[in-house]
Amino acid sequence: MYHYYSPDALRTXN
């Protein structure tokens, strides 16, 4: 999986 900043990624808490 690629590590890119996204509104969805922040939702997971990164």
Curated annotation (Swiss-Prot):
It comes from the Bacteria. The keyword Transferase applies. Its EC number is 2.5.1.18. Its main location: cytoplasm. One of its GO terms (molecular function) is glutathione transferase activity. Keywords: Cytoplasm, Transferase. It catalyses: RX + glutathione = an S-substituted glutathione + a halide anion + H(+). One of its GO terms (cellular component) is cytoplasm. It is found in: Cytoplasm. It is an enzyme of class 2 (transferase). The keyword Iron-sulfur does not apply. Monomer and homodimer. Conjugation of reduced glutathione to a wide number of exogenous and endogenous hydrophobic electrophiles. Belongs to the GST superfamily. This is Glutathione S-transferase. It comes from Pseudomonas putida.
